[in-house]
Amino acid sequence: MPANSPKQQFDIAILGGGISSSLTLLHLIRNLLSLNRPQKEISIVVVEKQNEFWKGFPYGKRSSINSLTITTLGEFVPEKEKKSFIGWLDSTQDKWIGLLKTHGGDASVKWIENNYPMIQKKQWDEIYIPRFLFGDYVDEKLQEAIQNVRAKGLANIHLIEAEATNLLKKDNAQYEAELKEKNGETISVVAGKIILAIGSPPVKSIQSPLSGNSGYLYIEDAYLPGIENNIDSIAQLFSAITDQNKRNILIVGSNASTLEFLYLIQHESEIKKLLNKIIAISYSGLLPHRITPNNFPNYQFSNLISLREKKNYTSTELMDTIEKDMQIAYAKGVHIGDTYYQLSDLVVELLNKLDENQQKDFHSTYGWRFTKLIRRAGAEYRDAAEELIQQKKLDLLKGKFLSVVASKNDPAFGVLNYISSTSQELTHPLLFPAVINCSGFEELNACSSELINNLVKQGLCTINSTNRGFEVSEKFEANDNLYIVGPLLGGIFNNKLRYWHVENARRIYTVGEMLAEILVNQ
């Protein structure tokens, strides 16, 4: 139900309509439906700037129909939702496999060929599923829940398509959220409780505002307007370039988005024929590690094992030892994908032996660094990247990105300037008509989000020590009746939860469940 008149009053306003919002709302409605006591109807408004509610970019139309989960279903899906989700996959199998066959192209054909035998055997835990399936499942379950809670007169859910830009704390212990509609007009809603569920901060820009209107194609965010749209734009661009050697793509970053882009490119025959080279530059020069069976079950991280025998050590010693042992493992041909669980269990054990202050220091200072060291990805994604390397279509470049500037000889192409692994400042010899930013998200103290900046400026939210999330109480409050869910909880450290990132579906589900229980009990 739309709600577009100014300053409408609600009990709860959820700012953001992606997966953090939908999972929290689903838990909240389930709790309301399970109550055995009468209560007044709760009014809830959900505000989302994109024209798609409940899925966010990972599980919605901004991703590809061929975008896969980065880990297997067994690791990805929330444990409490697993039986229901697998039942849904089974019951709707003909529909979604038909959809893949009709709209998924070569990538879907290969995915079905590789995974259908496991689907028939019900071996779901081992499959890297198309992500849109989880988005469709959550959407369906939430729509059913909304209908039920409305029918019982327990809650009424309103939707507004607009961008939240500011939040004002009123004298009567309520909040006024200022919203910018698509037409540029500003409206407001008032609510007693606010749930901030806006997802991750904006992507960190690599394009200088002073660069002006360069002739090359610069894609600031791989998922805006959508990853398939951007691949189509590159294909059209390449078709107009007669010189094969100039049909190059520069990707800045080597994260999961980079890997997904490579996977999709590998299965797009049209653009593959046109493509000369993809250069992916990053500090590490590495993509996330391939998830493999435990190939080295008896491998010993000797320095970490020795550290375990010490009575006292610091968070810095722990991080240094992790990096030292990982370097030794790599030198022996053992990668994190082969020994992930041994390493993780050992690090958790050593982390728990630290005192409270040192544990918090590890979370704040080294948590994200450790996460980047142990990044993993599924076989389909890593194999596609390896195939591109073998076909001499992909080079992984280790170095520090400096800038992309328009070529002096032909502004329709970008030129990469970088510092090499040997500390030399270099210009890459290739020209790039397409540049894709996969460098990650902004830190909060240098954020371009109007809402985030206003929350900090007014003192409603305080940036935590990781610079990736907000300080919250054990009730997830950044301020009185102002709750945070999703990625902006990154760095949370209290007696209930200790996460240095809250980006995967399992963690978001857990937080949403806990917050819903808090709200219902209030």
Where are the regions that the model predicts?
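Flavin (primarily FAD) cofactor-binding/catalytic cores of flavoenzymes
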Residues: 2-63, 116-256, 260-522
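Redox-cofactor-proximal catalytic regions of oxidoreductases
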Residues: 48-116
